[in-house]
Amino acid sequence: MAFLYREPLERPGLVLRELIEKRDIVVAPGVYNPAVALLAERMGFEALYLSGAAITGSLAMPDLGLITLSELAMFTSYITRVVRVPVIVDADTGFGEAINVERTVRELERAGAAAIQIEDQVMPKKCGHLQGKALISPEDMVKKIIAAVGARRDALIVARTDARGVEGFEKAVERAQLYVEAGADIIFPEALTSLEEFREFARRVKAPLLANMTEFGKTPYITVDQFREAGYKIVIFPVTTFRASLKASETVLREIMEKGTQKDILDKLYTRTEFYDLIGYHDYEKRDAEVSRKAEELLARHNNSRTG
């Protein structure tokens, strides 16, 4: 059904909390626009991840915290008004200090976020799998978490620590344990380097855990089943759809450049029928016809009353 005629998801934070409690593990693919979000929902995914890296990438910018809170809230609302599954939103460092994080949480929850992720890097932040990251103090991150928890209505607060690549595994565990005490609902250990590290982290941090299965990074390729067995409740694939879209576009553009036609790669394209079905195109036509019919009936009654 066309999203304009669907009721929005009510209290998405509670929906996500219940989903985490009911499922062994929740798989949340990364999305960066409403069409991809709608496709992911159509395919059966029960939660989505709005990736900061994918958003900035779609704007041809690096993942350095360059977008604004207003832009992120806009992207969030575009996606949450289309789908009826909870969306986890990557808010990078929270757009400032603790008092700024309060507004960030309120704005993103108002935009429909089910969970809001904040990390412990300094600004400008970096992709979690690059060298040269720097961290704020544990105390400053605790302040942000306390502020976030105090500002939210239902949204879950995801605390990401990038300490593994800066201070080492033990410090990552220590920070995570502190963040749980501060009230974080979910802990996200970024850039762990082996399945055994993920297992050890889960043994020592008593909270729902989120694993990042990105590509071309420091984390080896680990399956959803392996993460489940290691004790993780959520696994995200944050930039996979964005990377796939770029590669597919490159293939199509090269075909047009070299052959001057796309006819030999039609099997690689989403058809008109498939796209119309995805967005509920015919629902719009039906609605337009219904409005026209009602208008005609009203005008007919009006004309009859005048002539009668």
Curated annotation (Swiss-Prot):
One Pfam family in the UniProt entry: PEP_mutase
The protein's role, per its UniProt record: Involved in the catabolism of short chain fatty acids (SCFA) via the 2-methylcitrate cycle I (propionate degradation route). Catalyzes the thermodynamically favored C-C bond cleavage of (2R,3S)-2-methylisocitrate to yield pyruvate and succinate via an alpha-carboxy-carbanion intermediate.
Family, per entry: Belongs to the isocitrate lyase/PEP mutase superfamily. Methylisocitrate lyase family.
Protein name in the entry: 2-methylisocitrate lyase
Pathway in which this enzyme or protein is active: Organic acid metabolism; propanoate degradation
GO function term, MF aspect, one: magnesium ion binding
Gene name as annotated: prpB
Binding residue positions for Mg(2+): 90, 92
Protein source organism: Aeropyrum pernix (strain ATCC 700893 / DSM 11879 / JCM 9820 / NBRC 100138 / K1)
UniProt cross-references to HAMAP family, sorted A to Z: PrpB (MF_01939)
